[in-house]
Amino acid sequence: MAETSKKPRLMRLAPILGIGLVALIGAILLRDTLSFDALAENREALTAFRDAHYVVTAAAFMLAYTAIVGFSLPGATIATLTGGFLFGIFPGALFNVLAATLGATLIFLAARYGLGDRLSRRMDASEGMVRKIKTGIDENQWSMLFLIRLVPAVPFFVANLVPALVNVPLYRFFVSTALGIVPGAVVYTSVGAGLGEVFAKGETPNLGIIFEPHILLPILGLCALAILPVILNAVRGKKGI
């Protein structure tokens, strides 16, 4: 009987374990393939293929980007730069956002299938601080989801897992991801759109540009707007409003 109960549990964990295994293998095998140097070396072949087969290139790019994010492979930043390099700020940013959102959704579904429902039930049944945290997230889901997407310091993989573990509805996850990653995607896509000049000078792009004041401050402003409802709810709760 115990053996029978273990099998469904292992089957439920199979998707997230498979992603973890592919991520580990990818980190070893693709470390040099999905890199800025590889993009620089193959840029002429990529642009020539794009010019000859634009639709195929766009579809293949989005499929590859979705796989990179969905399997947590190294190279998501390089993929974003590549989107800008090949397709410009627009539709490059659109391709990047859509592919990243689809990849994030794959991780979300795998994690929720394996762990989310069970962990969420345990948190609902618990008491004390754990229950308060779960209740706080449930009451402010939209704000929290946008916040973890907007804050540059939150790793993308973490922002995909946490909502799954607290049983956030799929549509909320998808919408908040698609909208929340837009600022960062536009910034890095614009960097990618300027790679032609960077390649010509033999330089490397400034990937720390998102932390420069003229870009970081507006993003922090969006973070403040995202967390404002949480603060207002907390104040109202204390005052009994």
Language model features with spans:
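Hydrophobic alpha-helical membrane-insertion segments
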Residues: 15-26, 167-186
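Transmembrane alpha-helix boundary and packing residues in multipass membrane permease domains
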Residues: 80-81, 108, 117, 160-161, ...
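Hydrophobic H-region at the start of alpha-helical membrane spans
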Residues: 10-21, 213-224
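Membrane-interfacial helix-loop-helix
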Residues: 2-6, 13, 24-62, 101-158, ...
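Transmembrane helix boundary and interhelical junction motifs in multipass membrane proteins
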Residues: 65-94, 153-161, 171, 181-187
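Hydrophobic residues within alpha-helical transmembrane segments
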Residues: 63, 67, 94, 98-102, ...
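Non-cytoplasmic
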Residues: 181, 185-198, 203
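Transmembrane alpha-helices and adjacent helix-loop boundaries
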Residues: 100-104, 114, 181-189
